[in-house]
């Protein structure tokens, strides 16, 4: 790991911990997804927060051409940025928006499994499924996503995470189900579908489980995986109340106070 990676990782970790903004990082330093991933891994190591799972990002293939992406990315989810269903989180000026996702609770036994995770064996590691809202934002002074590496290096843009009730659900039924993220304050509905998540949230889950095992990112407890947004990113204002519904899975809500 070179010195520039360490310096940028340190700065991004400090910005997240102290909830402060960094000046815009030069695109040339983070445009390579592999370098951006190294920056993220170092920032995660320096943050010293408590991981509770992982998030997959860039799972909507229709965005890959714009982002020049060849595959998704992943980063940690943290206890310190997790909120209770129907709870409140403080507004932050760096917020981009809210997303509605499908989340899985996974047995940590998956790390002892010596074979590749596939559709035929993944179900043995799934404890349950839940709807989830992820709030995303920057730790830098900028207004829009200009490259994939900026998303990857900045903790995958994760700011907050909340899940609804965990439930059992047939994996065969999750391929294409309707979702709706609602801004109750603005009285606007934003429909979506799980099929935009790599064609199926299970595909995203399988990809992520194989990636974290390959990178030796082992957790000693059962953990969460969010698979990517089933809706557009919905802008956030202070006072907004968001509720999300995934057909057959239930609902989840979060107030931005």
Report the location of each language-model feature.
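Catalytic-core "active-site belt" of small-molecule-metabolizing enzymes
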Residues: 2-200, 206, 233, 238-241, ...
